[in-house]
C-alpha cells in the first residue's frame, strides 16, 4: 500500500507531531480539536485502568506511561509532567494487552492538521478514526451533549480545492 520511504517518513512525522513513539498508536483512533475532550479521555482512561479489563496503560505525550494499578497521586504527578503543549498534535494512548486500545489525538485548529495527521496515521492501517466534538451548530431538536454524526463539510475554506473540485460534495 505504501512504499518504505513513505512509511519511514510518516512514522517519523507521527513522533514529531504527537510527542509519542509511533508504536504506541492504537488501531482505534479519536481525533478532536477541543482540549476538554483530552481531559475527559484522561479521566476515563484512568478509571479504566482501575477496573478489571484488557487496558494496561495510558501513554501521554513525551512517552510518559501510567500503568494499571498506579495510585492516583502517582498518576496525577505524571500527568502534570507531560509536556503536551510542546507538540502540534499531542496524542494519548490507552493500550491493551492485545494491541486493541484507543488513541486520542488533539489535532488543534484547522483542516490542514486533520489532513496531515490522517495522512501519516494511514501507514499504520488503523481500524477506524473518528472526529469527536466537532459540530458547527445544533438543530432545534438537539441539546448540548447529544451524539452528532457529521455527514457534510462546507467547502468555504478552499483547503481541498486543488485536490477535489469545489462542485464535488464531501
Annotate each PLM feature:
Residues 1-106:
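N-terminal short beta-loop-beta anion/metal-coordinating cradle
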